[in-house]
From Swiss-Prot:
GO terms for molecular function: succinylglutamate-semialdehyde dehydrogenase activity. Its EC number is 1.2.1.71. It comes from Ectopseudomonas mendocina (strain ymp). HAMAP family: Aldedh_AstD. Keywords: Arginine metabolism, NAD, Oxidoreductase. This is N-succinylglutamate 5-semialdehyde dehydrogenase. The gene is astD. NAD(+) binds at residues 221-226. Catalyzes the NAD-dependent reduction of succinylglutamate semialdehyde into succinylglutamate. The keyword NAD applies. The active site is at residues 244, 278. It is an enzyme of class 1 (oxidoreductase). The keyword NAD applies. It comes from the Bacteria.
Amino acid sequence: MSTHYIAGQWRPGQGAPLQSLDPVSQAVVWQGQGASAAQVDEAVNAARGAFSLWAAHSLDGRIAVLERFAAALKSHADELARAIGEETGKPLWEAATEVTSMVNKVAISIQSYRERTGEKSGPLADATAVLRHKPHGVVAVFGPYNFPGHLPNGHIVPALLAGNCVLFKPSELTPKVAELTVKCWIEAGLPAGVLNLLQGGRETGVALAGHPGIDGLFFTGSSRTGNLLHAQFAGRPDKILALEMGGNNPLIVDQVADIDAAVYTIVQSAFISAGQRCTCARRLLVPQGQWGDALLARLVQVAGQLKVGRFDEQPAPFMGSVISLQAAAQLMQAQADLLAKGATALLAMTQPQADAALLTPGILDVTAVSERPDEEFFGPLLQVIRYSDFDGAIAEANTTAFGLAAGLLSDSKARYEQFWLHSRAGIVNWNKQLTGAASTAPFGGIGASGNHRASAYYAADYCAYPVASLESEALTLPTTLTPGVTL
């Protein structure tokens, strides 16, 4: 099978065998072989060879290619959505929204480039001060499995717009989505070598991340891998590194008037995408007492009735599967570990079929657990912590090395202002689901959640570097010379 796209040609892989599976049926969706180190080298050289012409291409010319890419995505939307559903397990309705986000990223990136990294000038004494931006050169993009189209697209589109050439290494769990996306770029007329696709697992990733021919790496994925990349790039100020690594996100519930509105927002925050969004709520902070008890009882009732099913099931499920049987097993083990440490199951997460990666929502009260792990349990497992006062709830919310998202459900603006002031997160929401974000806002966090603001409006900032110039069309002698100089 032709697995990789290098220098404008589809090539079979020379590395380890690779296949993606439908996480529910375990049917093979895609198969091939990963890229070898030699093929990584070939792809880097192809990108390096294409860079000068692509960077010299006019901005309008690059925009035209991007807009044709958006048109290709629209024309293949159903095929892409089905591939996303097949490989990730997310319901078709949700997969379709991901394709829409991919399309919209083009216009957003163009607007962002013009506003944040376009050309600006102004008079300065007898010269003109000009700010322009240049592409870094050849950059690697490592994509995640949870949004295999949208999230790598959020790096690739602004990188190409800025004039970079790209080496795209998708998750080894979602190669089909990556292949279809690259075919849309080909349909758009992207020149050979400007975008190269390298499928593969660890072997391919290590070879690409360590290649001396790349000028930077843009990564969305696990904290573990992101930390390894950060250590690898330490001491290399000549290379740009952008990381988005998820979080252990808190959602505080104040005593609100509308319990059902709170429950619905919690469900959307914790269990959308089967809990496989980096901004999903992992910790729910609920006040002690009768009102908090009533909220949790209603939450357990609603969460226990959520429809879970295969991606193309009709009527459509709210939740699909997690990405793999291995991921399901790890989540079930995480629940068992928390229960062994003293947690109480308000709603036990279950795996109805041993041979399918479908999990039902889990809600555990971990208030009594003295040493709660500061980990991102990437699935439908929500931890509840009861609090006695609002100051204590904010302090508890901040007890994490991560800092991606935090939220508050409250009828009090004063409490939200207090929460916003003291929250340690890059995304802070009030009375909105934690997974919600504006496309024109930066996306990312602080601490162990990463650096820069990956794959969103501020992606333009790390896809090009600023060049400041003082310019004058004529070389003239100043009327007053510097003291000590005689001409």
